[in-house]
């Protein structure tokens, strides 16, 4: 619990939060064209680039043809993204690629002069007592955005807690803009049809909808999850190393959110200590 864990695609929901702050502060609009922020790349050989908007990146609708095998060691991820071919014209269908989020990160850096994590620090990390975490970056100082963030489980719980309280912290302080919380976590687009119900309930702004009504999650490879249940005033953070993600989901839904309805259990100091010992030995 005291060791930062790689989040894989859970990083996307953190980047989304930065976009929410930037929108609230009037630094960008979801309808802004991506090329607006990168005029130095206007000579790109891909004319569809001129159609791309911030909203399309958020909802995985750039329809760029990029695979996980593409080189991430290059020094200019923006150039790599803009040079990549299109699978379909932009905004045609849901096509989940992490590079959409790396472009959002690059946009935040371009308009603020700061990396995403530096931009977030005074707005949410410092107020909630979260130490600035490590985030993989490119040669231009852009955080990866869609991957590569390392955070402790407890810090993740702090970060996402406002997402079940309309953006507010436990004391009522507004941390994340309430409008962003509502829009980012509701279904914005249809998602994939891969046979797994957890992936078929719709996608917001870098948040997945759950099969359970009024619930959503941040989601990363190998079982990294933060499940959010506003109705139960609860969230659950998981950090795993399970190659078959569906197994994590299957076990989780076996117990949650049903267990939230059990009420308060009687005090049992021995079992409580056993739980703490188990956590410490993880």
Go through the PLM ranges and name each one.
Residues 126, 131-181, 185:
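Flexible, glycine-rich surface segments
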Residues 215-282:
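Structured C-terminal helix/loop/strand segments within mature extracytoplasmic catalytic/sensor domains
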């Amino acid at each position: 619990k005291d060791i930062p864990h790689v989040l894989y695609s859970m990083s996307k929901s953190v980047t989304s939060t930065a976009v929410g702050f930037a929108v609230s502060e009037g630094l960008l609009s979801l309808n802004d064209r991506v090329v607006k922020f990168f005029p130095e790349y206007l000579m790109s050989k891909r004319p569809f680039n001129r159609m791309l908007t911030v909203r399309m990146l958020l909802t995985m609708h750039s329809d760029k043809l990029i695979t996980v095998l593409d080189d991430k060691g290059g020094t200019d991820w923006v150039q790599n993204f803009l040079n990549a071919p299109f699978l379909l014209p932009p905004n045609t269908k849901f096509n989940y690629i992490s590079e959409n989020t790396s472009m959002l990160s690059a946009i935040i850096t371009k308009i603020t002069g700061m990396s995403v994590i530096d931009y977030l620090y005074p707005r949410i990390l410092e107020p909630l007592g979260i130490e600035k975490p490590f985030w993989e970056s490119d040669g231009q100082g852009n955080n990866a955005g869609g991957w590569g963030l390392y955070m402790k489980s407890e810090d993740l719980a702090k970060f996402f807690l406002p997402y079940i309280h309309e953006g507010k912290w436990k004391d009522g302080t507004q941390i994340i803009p309430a409008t962003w919380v509502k829009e980012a976590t509701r279904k914005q687009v249809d998602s994939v049809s891969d046979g797994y119900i957890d992936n078929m309930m719709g996608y917001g702004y870098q948040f997945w909808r759950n099969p359970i009504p009024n619930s959503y999650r941040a989601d990363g490879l190998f079982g990294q999850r933060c499940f959010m249940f506003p109705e139960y005033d609860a969230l659950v953070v998981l950090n795993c190393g399970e190659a078959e993600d569906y197994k994590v989901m299957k076990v989780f839904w076996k117990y949650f959110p049903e267990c939230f309805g059990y009420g308060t259990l009687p005090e049992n100091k021995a079992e409580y200590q056993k739980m703490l010992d188990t956590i410490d030995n993880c």
